[in-house]
Amino acid sequence: MLFESFDLVSALATLAACLVSMALLLAVPQQLWQLRWTATRDKSCKLPMPKGSMGFPIIGETCHWFFQGAGFHASRRQKYGNVFKTHLLGRPLIRVTGAENVRKVLMGEHSLVTVDWPQSTSTLLGPNSLANSIGDIHRKRRKIFAKVFSHEALESYLPKIQQVIQETLRVWSSNPDPINVYRESQRLSFNMAVRVLLGFRIPEEEMHCLFSTFQEFVENVFSLPIDLPFSGYRKGIRARDSLQKSIEKAIREKPLHTQGKDYTDALDVLLESAKENNTELTMQELKESTIELIFAAFATTASASTSLVMQLLRHPAVLEKLREELRSCGLLHDGCLCQGELRLDSIISLKYLDCVIKEVLRLFAPVSGGYRIATQTFELDGVQVPKGWSVMYSIRDTHDTSAVFKDVEAFDPDRFSPERSEDREGRFHYLPFGGGVRSCLGKQLATLFLKLLAVELAGGSRFELSTRTFPRMISVPVVHPTDGLRVKFFGLDSNQNQIMAKSDEMLDATV
């Protein structure tokens, strides 16, 4: 019996020793990894490094970030403050939240910081993309791109965008099954970008293949830069190469399809603007610019479109107020949108619609933030940002923590009304499109698209949630519902109006 006790104690001691050894094997490399990055502080600066954790060797905290989403940043912000360090997507970075901190980063372009995307993003978008250009090259390219989003250009795109939205909503309404709004909004954004902005005439079957390829590209834009078979990075590269091949074919065939064309598309404007600035774009530059245009329209617009549908479902009073504005402006009559094309000035004049879109983008900013790299050591919120470190300024967290917005978690479009104007306190409290010299060039186009979608939803559709509860939102790679948001859409022809009039009382979630 005594020997059996010794055997048990010995086994427990061995197990304990193994557990301690394993803990040390994990803890020691992790501690050395932490020290490795702490040692990069600027010793000539007396300020301390930001607090934070660098996670595990090589992968850092990438897995935590991927699975926790917005909760990852919120938990670390609560623990370490508005400026903290971490290690994501294969590199160290300092995450920055708060209007004043963000203002210093954005206004410090060319003096304190310059652009610096994660390696995977930079590689997949390409060296000729606007996002990757710096200095004089960036200023020149931005000037060329600016004409693509001018008032005149938007007026030209508007009828075609409205037509694509109307056709899409008709398809949704004719489907007897619920629609996955996020996935179909991606398809809508993609069709708008390819057919309207770029003017490509691609067969439907080829469009389906191109859409799937682009989805794979977007899903791997933010990935660990490890080029191995079956890695996300390798999938992204393959998707990029396939897209460039298809786009080159479409660009070369484009002059063959000009007959009967009644508007100027973004690619036409881009080429014309380049000539006006004494620049001739190479085929590689055109391919990368085209992918960048589609990318900008695809992921973020689909995210915001889905958030818009969800909030109109959640808040029927907001939708009814939107309909009332359309009625008062003569755009909605007897429950249906008046026939004819909308004008850009008419859309701009809809003030409550503008408030609704602004509030959707405040509460559900599609993009988490932007990336920079410190070109010199500087102070931020009492800590040092060492030269050479990546900096990510947070859009979403800055919105969530801003003191200028009352009841910050509530969906309240009237906060942007002329009477309240909660965003007047400072432009860096509200920045869904970034800020500074790198603010999103396409913000007016994105806003126009969302406004047109809202008008068509309010005046030309009835829709209801097909699940018992609203889904949870996740933020990687952009904000979207976990289930895509399952919604049943109904048409508004005369017969359908009678059906809906009878069923409205029974469908509390129908708007």
UniProtKB/Swiss-Prot annotation:
One of its GO terms (biological process) is bone morphogenesis. Its cofactor is heme. Its EC number is 1.14.13.-. Heme binds at C440. It catalyses: all-trans-retinoate + reduced [NADPH--hemoprotein reductase] + O2 = all-trans-4-hydroxyretinoate + oxidized [NADPH--hemoprotein reductase] + H2O + H(+); all-trans-retinoate + reduced [NADPH--hemoprotein reductase] + O2 = all-trans-18-hydroxyretinoate + oxidized [NADPH--hemoprotein reductase] + H2O + H(+). It holds the Pfam family p450. One of its GO terms (molecular function) is retinoic acid 4-hydroxylase activity. GO terms for cellular component: endoplasmic reticulum membrane. It is a peripheral membrane protein. Keywords: Endoplasmic reticulum, Heme, Iron, Lipid metabolism, Membrane, Metal-binding, Microsome, Monooxygenase, Oxidoreductase. The keyword Lipoprotein does not apply. Its main location: endoplasmic reticulum. CDD domains: CYP26B1. It is found in: Endoplasmic reticulum membrane; Microsome membrane. Belongs to the cytochrome P450 family. A cytochrome P450 monooxygenase involved in the metabolism of retinoates (RAs), the active metabolites of vitamin A, and critical signaling molecules in animals. RAs exist as at least four different isomers: all-trans-RA (atRA), 9-cis-RA, 13-cis-RA, and 9,13-dicis-RA, where atRA is considered to be the biologically active isomer, although 9-cis-RA and 13-cis-RA also have activity. This is Cytochrome P450 26B1. The lineage of its organism: Eukaryota, Metazoa, Chordata, Craniata, Vertebrata.
